[in-house]
Every structure is written in C-alpha cells, then in structure tokens.
C-alpha cells in the first residue's frame, strides 16, 4: 500500500454544551460529545430498534473553535470531518487509561452546522452553515498557461 488514510466523517447531535478550555499558551480547545443513532427494524418482532453511539470530539483548529464557541449548543446537529486519535495517560492511581477521540486540528478538518436554529446569519440557501479550515482552498489549474505544442 502506497499510503494510508485516517479520516472520520460523522453526522450527529451534540450531547451537551461544548466545553471550552484554554491552554497555558492561551490557545482554546473545545471538547464535545456527538451522538450518532442507528435505527433498524427487527426481523423477528418487526419492532423499530435503535442504538446510539457517543463520540468524543476535540477541536484544536482556531477557526473551528470560534464557530463552535458562537453557534454550537446542546442538541445542535453537526457534520464533522476529522481524524481518529487514541490518547494514553496514567490516572491518579498510576493505572494506564486510554481514550479514542475524533480530532479536528488541521487543514483537512471540517465542521458544518446542519440545523438552521443555530446558524443565525451564517445560513446559506440550503439552511446550512459551513466552515472549512482556511488552508483548505480549492486551487484551480489554469489551462490557458499551457502551450499548444506537445513536447514529444
């Protein structure tokens, strides 16, 4: 395999108001819980069943932090793209602990507000508010710069 990919895409609802922390250097970090729910019909009983999975999300990107800070509250519906990371630490008793989180920190992270109730002035025609990290720009190639002659 030539490379690898670590990308997580989730659509879900925020379980509680985002937690905003500030590092010693003054950088803001946001932690939030995102619920995704799967529904299906039981083949035997024909009952509707559902299972909710909770995802820990950590946001380091300054632009995304400011959007979440202003517009995201408990119940907000979000589309997020990030990467999966597992952290390891020792608790107070010295026992190793692990947690796996969806991390939004670099140019390939994305967050879209899917419910219009929280998007206020950031509503597009589709009722969504979207923010991509500033480095995620579409660079188009200008074909007019090419010579008409083929070099071989």
Curated annotation (Swiss-Prot):
Plays an important role in DNA replication, recombination and repair. Binds to ssDNA and to an array of partner proteins to recruit them to their sites of action during DNA metabolism. Residues 54-60 bind DNA. The gene is ssb. Residues 115-124 have a biased composition (Polar residues). One of its GO terms (biological process) is DNA replication. The keyword Thylakoid does not apply. Residues 115-152 are annotated as: Disordered. A motif (Important for interaction with partner proteins) lies at residues 147-152. Keywords: DNA damage, DNA recombination, DNA repair, DNA replication, DNA-binding. This is Single-stranded DNA-binding protein. The keyword DNA damage applies. Residues 5-111 form the SSB domain. Residues 125-144 have a biased composition (Basic and acidic residues). GO terms for molecular function: single-stranded DNA binding. PROSITE patterns: SSB. Homotetramer. One of its GO terms (cellular component) is nucleoid. Pfam families: SSB.
């Amino acid at each position: 395999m030539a490379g690898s990919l670590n990308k997580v895409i989730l659509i879900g609802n925020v379980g509680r108001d985002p937690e905003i922390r500030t590092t010693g250097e003054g950088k803001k970090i946001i932690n939030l819980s995102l619920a995704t729910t799967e529904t299906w019909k039981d083949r035997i009983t024909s009952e509707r069943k559902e299972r909710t999975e909770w995802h820990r999300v950590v946001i380091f990107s300054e632009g995304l932090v400011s959007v979440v800070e202003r517009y995201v509250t408990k119940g907000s519906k979000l589309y997020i793209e990030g990467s999966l990371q597992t952290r390891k630490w020792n608790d107070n008793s010295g026992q190793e602990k692990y947690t796996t989180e969806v991390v939004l920190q670099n140019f390939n992270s994305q967050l879209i507000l899917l419910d219009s109730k929280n998007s206020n002035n950031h509503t597009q025609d589709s009722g969504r508010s979207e923010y991509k990290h500033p480095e995620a720009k579409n660079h188009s190639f200008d074909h007019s710069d090419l010579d008409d002659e083929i070099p071989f």
